A protein has these predicted regions:
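Solvent-exposed N-terminal domain segments of exported/luminal and surface proteins
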Residues: 92-95
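Outer-membrane pore/translocation modules
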Residues: 25-34, 97-242, 253-257, 261, ...
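Surface-exposed strand-loop-strand hairpins of Gram-negative outer-membrane beta-barrel proteins
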Residues: 75-87
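Extracytoplasmic
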Residues: 64-68, 86, 99
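Cleavable N-terminal export/targeting peptides
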Residues: 1-50, 56-60
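Outer-membrane beta-barrel "beta-signal"
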Residues: 297, 308-322
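Transmembrane beta-strand segments of Gram-negative outer membrane beta-barrel proteins
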Residues: 59-77, 159-163, 190-193, 257
Length: 322
């Protein structure tokens, strides 16, 4: 019963916002204060990207620079960590004057590293005091990253590569390489393998492997099994793994519903190799405007390392896309 008391408010909030979004989308005017602010930010991004492009060399007016930006607020709640929230940003500026392969990326790179995870893995902060729900220092450091990216795709081999050189917070100069390959076995079944490695002068080693197997069972649904392996070596070495088996439904209006089972653990000494398992449900749709998204998620995981049985965890992401 106690678990239901924690879960019910989350369900009510998610359902109410979803219903309100349906009504508001129908009444969209595209002329409110929020719309004007969104337009202003987009125009500023466009202006900045073209100013940078012009400064770098002679430009082609038929191929202007472009920029994209995602601004997110991640909110999480459970009975142990209580409520936490974290602002996150991730952006990209394409610069045609530097050839089509080069761009500038900035913001929290974990948004890209974990973009293949359908469910929420991890938490907003590490080692956050129980009486706090926000860590300005950690949030600022995670978002303080900028790099020049060289991208290439070998179509004959189906391989895509990104190589970043940049600067993170605290003077952390880093290089990052991402290689991915997608193999279409049949019209309905495909495999995608992605390898990410980053080395920083302060953050040291980060290595992550993503493996996906996807089966399309209809025009609007597919079944996915996603496995990741992760290794970090900063002050200490940490290794972990996770596997999500889920089904996703795609609806009109950029709406998706996913549900499945997650398992995960650690390979480190004194840690459970099979630490967590449980079901999750996540939903995503525009709310109020086509550029504003809401993504609630409810999961029921355990935690053997901390002697915790299965408990409800609520997660909500509000995201503005520019």
């Amino acid at each position: 019963m106690n678990k239901l008391n924690y879960l019910i408010p989350t369900l009510i909030a998610a359902t109410s916002l979803s219903a309100y979004a349906e009504q508001s989308n129908a009444e969209e005017t595209e002329n409110t204060w929020a719309d004007q602010q969104h337009k202003t930010v987009k125009q500023s991004l466009h202006s900045w990207s073209n100013n940078i492009n012009d400064w770098l060399g002679e430009t082609d007016q038929s191929k202007p620079a472009s920029a994209s930006l995602r601004v997110m607020m991640d909110m999480e709640w459970n009975r142990y960590s209580r409520f936490t929230y974290k602002p996150r940003v991730r952006g990209k500026i394409k610069l045609p004057v530097l050839k089509k392969h080069l761009s500038v990326v900035f913001g929290d790179e974990d948004i890209e590293n974990q973009s293949r995870d359908k469910n929420r893995v991890g938490k907003n902060y590490e080692n956050l005091e129980r009486n706090r729900n926000y860590d300005a220092h950690q949030a600022r450091n995670d978002n303080a990253s900028m790099a020049l990216r060289w991208s290439n795709a070998a179509k004959e081999f189906g391989v895509k590569t990104d190589f970043d050189v940049g600067l993170r917070s605290m003077g952390d100069i880093f290089g990052r390489l991402r290689i991915s390959k997608k193999q279409e076995w049949t019209e309905n079944f495909s495999t995608r393998l992605e390898q990410i490695y980053r080395y920083g002068s302060r953050s040291r080693h980060y290595l992550r492997t993503n493996l996906e197997n996807r089966y399309i069972d209809s025009d609007s649904t597919f079944i996915m099994n996603h496995t990741f392996l992760q290794y970090t070596h900063n002050k200490e070495e940490e290794t972990g793994w996770g596997n999500s088996l889920y089904r996703q439904h795609t609806f009109s209006g950029f709406k998706t519903l996913s549900y499945g089972i997650f398992t995960g653990g650690r390979f480190d000494k004194d840690r459970s190799k099979f630490n967590t398992w449980g079901p999750f449900v996540t939903y995503r749709q525009p709310i109020l405007r086509k550029w504003l998204f809401i993504q609630p998620e409810i999961s029921l995981y355990n935690d053997k390392d901390n002697n915790r049985g299965h408990y409800f965890n609520g997660f909500m992401r509000l995201e503005a896309v520019f």
